[in-house]
């Protein structure tokens, strides 16, 4: 009889433990809601700069702020014009759909200010020339979060002004040069950023 009571108690204990484990398993229990992230712009080295971003979520407002800095010359010089300088940008993300579980995840709209400042060798006479441009962009994107891994995909466009480079590329945005037309006041930008949350 004691053997059967012991088996019954053991069976009850195991079944209660398994039920409790199943009921406590939710995606939220496996996915923490991190409010900060550090990101690198994927393949930015191939365009002549290294870009690092920091993002902070404001979960009560379904928003986040993101600042990005870029060291121009830390990468492959695709135009062979030896650029040296920096880019600064700030974007404020407005997440478009309810996502109460993960503050940094989802589709978003982002207005963004960009300032690009660098010297390069001019294609016309190889003299050192200053490219000093600013831009105001509107971007749309999607940010994916899995545990601590983050991937950010976005594109957008807007208005630019300043002293443009003869390549039209400003290490953060490009001036319009498609469809047989060039416009130094239309800026386009797109990117993929990969990072970690904490």
Kindly label every feature range from the protein language model.
Residues 52, 78-82, 119-127, 164-172:
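Outer-membrane beta-barrel translocator domains and adjoining extracellular loop/strand segments
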Residues 20-74, 79-83, 193-197:
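Short glycine/proline- and aromatic-enriched beta-strand/turn motifs that initiate or cap beta-hairpins
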Residues 42-46, 56, 69-75, 94, ...:
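Transmembrane beta-strands of outer-membrane beta-barrel pores
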Residues 7-15:
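Bacterial N-terminal signal peptides
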Residues 89, 184-198:
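Outer-membrane beta-barrel "beta-signal"
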């Amino acid at each position: 009889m004691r053997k059967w009571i012991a088996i019954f108690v053991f069976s009850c204990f195991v079944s209660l433990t398994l039920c409790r484990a199943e009921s406590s398993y939710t995606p939220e229990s496996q996915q923490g809601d991190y409010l900060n992230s550090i990101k690198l712009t994927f393949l930015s080295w191939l365009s002549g700069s290294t870009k690092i971003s920091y993002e902070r979520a404001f979960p009560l407002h379904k928003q986040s702020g993101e600042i990005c800095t870029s060291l121009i010359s830390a990468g492959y010089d695709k135009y062979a014009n030896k650029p040296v300088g920096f880019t600064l940008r700030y974007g404020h993300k407005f997440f478009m759909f309810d996502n109460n579980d993960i503050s940094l995840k989802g589709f978003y709209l982002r207005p963004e200010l960009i300032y690009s400042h660098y010297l390069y060798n001019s294609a016309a006479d190889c003299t050192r020339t200053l490219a000093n441009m600013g831009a105001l962009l509107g971007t749309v994107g999607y940010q994916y979060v899995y545990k601590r891994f983050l991937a950010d995909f976005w594109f957008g466009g807007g208005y630019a002004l300043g002293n443009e480079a003869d390549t039209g590329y400003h290490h953060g945005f490009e001036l319009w040069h498609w469809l047989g037309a060039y416009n130094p006041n239309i800026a386009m930008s797109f990117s993929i950023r990969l990072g970690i949350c904490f």
